[in-house]
A protein has these predicted regions:
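Bacterial N-terminal signal peptides that target proteins for export
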Residues: 2-16
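Glycine-centered signal
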Residues: 6, 26-28
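Bacterial N-terminal signal peptides
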Residues: 14-25
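Acidic/polar surface patches and capping/hinge elements
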Residues: 30-430
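Short, solvent-exposed mixed-charge patches
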Residues: 433-436
Length: 436
């Protein structure tokens, strides 16, 4: 991973960046409406304040709708739903635009005016006529089908976990936790029951438990995060501070969609290939987070912030407490094991290396929320390694959380890829590249 610093400048956030994207076009403007509207979809979710796991679900809905619309016309892959019928000769480009637009406008009505402008701009590049009209109708049908399919998928209403009395190893609320009925409570409790997109059941992905508190493995992970993850650590290299800061502001959905767009352009993939790829990638990210939340609330393991302050209660003579420990970045408000970022990142990478190959790419990741940090990569493993480091050097995860998240994500990504959206005309489909 190479690290670049852009010039100092004012940070530009949220809706301002969304407006710029929609009015002036994304970096891949007019190259491929699937890629163009992927930029708009992710930016819209972020601008409207969605948290990382909600972003993942939403991106999967958009990209599966786009895939279903495009595939109803091209017929290259086995469909996700299969109920969308496209007239002969319908425009796949128009279908992609309309499918993304309709899902976006349904979920984010406050952004409708800017989405309308983006839709008009995209459709203006497509010749008028029956093909365009039929493509729009196909995209509309696909969007409505996906919206209906996910209407009662368990993602709402929000549910919270109220922690019990302090017990060594058990999760306790940290400073970021909201107050529910006067009690600081864990968020995302309902997410373990969200209907997956591409796996049958999150409970099929139950991990082995976290290391025992008295084990050498736990002590090693404890001492690492205490040393390099504290707010005032002198042992954290500047580049590890950068990745911790970057991935605190950047979800796996943001990072891996940006990477996927760049690699898809680099490899000159078709509209149909891109629609399938982005559907699979985002299905895997979303499903990995469902499975991760299932494991989190199953094991209910404490965060480093709690563990290190109470290090004299864990029964391990190798873990010295620091009652004043503060992490470098803010601890998310739910249990530690496994890492959501680690799970989602590795699920995305598992799909992407099967689609594109592991290495030899040129990927530049940036985020206007952290404008002075730009990260460059040539392989997907470099990204997942940085994300693993980011959460440990950020002080919010044990290394064992990251390792477990990686195992979970790789398993979910493999399952999503192997069981969804297969090529129609390949009787010897072999999972493309299987090199996790």
């Amino acid at each position: 991973m190479k690290r670049m610093h852009s010039g100092a400048g004012k940070r530009t956030f949220g809706l301002c960046m969304l407006m710029a994207t929609l009015l002036f076009g994304p970096a891949v403007a007019k190259a491929d409406p699937v890629l163009d509207w992927n930029v708009i979809a992710v930016d819209t979710a972020v601008a409207n304040g969605q948290n990382p796991y909600a972003q993942a679900r939403f991106a999967a809905i958009v990209q599966v709708a786009v895939f279903e619309a495009v595939n109803a016309i091209t017929g290259d892959y086995r469909p996700y739903i299969g109920s969308i019928v496209a007239p002969h000769g319908a425009s796949a480009n128009a279908a992609a635009v309309q499918a993304a637009y309709r899902v976006l406008s349904a979920y984010f009505p406050a952004s409708t005016s800017t989405l309308d402008a983006a839709r008009a701009s995209s459709l203006a590049s497509i010749p008028d006529g029956k093909a365009k009209i039929d493509g729009i109708a196909t995209g509309e049908a696909a969007a409505h089908a996906l919206i209906a399919l996910r209407a009662n998928d368990g993602s709402s209403p929000p549910q919270f976990e109220t922690p019990g009395p302090p017990v060594p190893g058990e999760w306790q609320a940290t400073v970021s936790c909201p107050s529910v009925n006067g009690v600081a409570s864990g968020i995302g409790f309902q997410w373990q029951n969200v209907t997956p997109f591409g796996i049958r059941n999150a409970k099929e992905f139950l991990l082995a438990p976290p290391p025992a508190l008295r084990s050498n493995e736990y002590a090693k992970a404890y001492n690492e995060v205490m040393t390099v993850g504290s707010l005032d650590s002198t042992e954290r290299p500047p580049d590890r501070s950068d990745v911790a800061t970057y991935y605190a502001a950047t979800s796996p959905t943001q990072a891996f969609n940006q990477a996927a767009r760049q690699v898809a352009q680099e490899q000159r993939h078709s509209l149909s290939e891109n629609a399938r790829a982005l559907a699979l990638i985002n299905m895997a990210i979303s499903d990995s987070l469902v499975a991760s939340f299932f494991n989190k609330y199953h094991y209910n393991f404490w965060r480093p912030e709690t563990a290190i302050r109470a290090g004299d209660t864990d029964g391990n003579r190798r873990t010295d407490p620091d009652p004043n420990f503060l992490p470098f970045i803010v601890t998310p408000c739910f249990p530690s094991y496994p890492s959501n970022h680690g799970s989602a990142a590795n699920a995305a990478a598992a799909v992407m290396r099967r689609l594109y190959g592991e290495a030899g790419h040129s990927m530049t990741l940036s985020n206007p929320a952290v404008p002075t940090i730009v990260l460059q990569y040539t392989s997907f493993r470099q990204i997942t390694n940085d994300i693993s480091d980011a959460r440990v050097y950020g002080g919010i995860h044990f290394r064992t959380d990251q390792d477990a998240g990686a195992l979970l994500g790789l398993a979910v990504g493999k399952a999503v890829y192997e069981h969804n959206l297969h090529p129609v005309h390949d009787d010897h489909w072999d999972n493309d590249r299987d090199d996790d």
